[in-house]
Amino acid sequence: MNDADVLGLFDQWNTALSTLNPDTVTALYADNAVLLPTVSNQVRHNHEEITDYFVGFLQKSPQGVVDEFNVNILSDTHVTNSGIYTFTFGDGSKVSARFSYLYVASDDGWKILQHHSSAMPEG
């Protein structure tokens, strides 16, 4: 696993967003994942809650671009990526947000164990 591989995990997630299918996106999260989403005050603790978030979020037709990233290879089974990304929505509006992902290797490939995303305070 190297920086390009970790960035590829984001690309996989972003491609899942483009399907507009919440189950496709949720499948990238570990069963015990935690999501602190960009446009919701509710912490999501499981697949049911994560899917519920993406049902609403995907209605906006989001596509993300990573503006800055910081990859850390913690072990053979755990990696992080944090930085800033910008979402462009179907209506042309945009939001920049800070993000952090903790990925864990599993029998099904790499899964998102923790995902935190928060809109930039200055807008």
Predicted regions and their residues:
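Aromatic/pi-system hotspot detector in well-structured domains
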Residues: 29
